[in-house]
């Protein structure tokens, strides 16, 4: 048994949910708490976990509570509407309406901390909410080396050639396998239903390829720092995300 209460802002853009578990049983099934008063079509960020939910999902399915450890556990969840994602989706949708294509590649790029991952995930949810098949692809799987080895290579280049040499390495074909990711975008535009994607881990040997089903997918979202590079081909709509150091 649980007791739960919530408050929602007048604009329906913020919600705070408090839950107390009154009774707990061994091997208890996952408990969901359904919210009320949200915008069904909006996407909300749960601030502590960083997970995203549509308003409809929060109101109809609810948010799962963590596995219990004792009775009278208390939880609190804070939700914030991702308004920037909604605004971006409206603009992207207008562009798509003006440029009718069977398949569209949208690149979201910007510096570290600019919100690429958060916005891309929310944008994907907006497309899915409208019944549009959308796949989110991370460009972080396409350097030549795993992160640890790439950091070592950056240091080697800097020690041997200084800042000029490092500028000639970062984000270029020397660091990034642009040919590989360009093949992915080309295959998507060609209408292929199965495309080989690359997956990169953090340790030696953790680079693999996987056949991925793209049937029913009409929008490919590419989220990547280098998504605006001249060496990247096949992007229909580039979206640059600008952020200040404070942000």
Segments (PLM) and residue ranges:
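Carbohydrate-binding surface patches
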Residues: 2-39
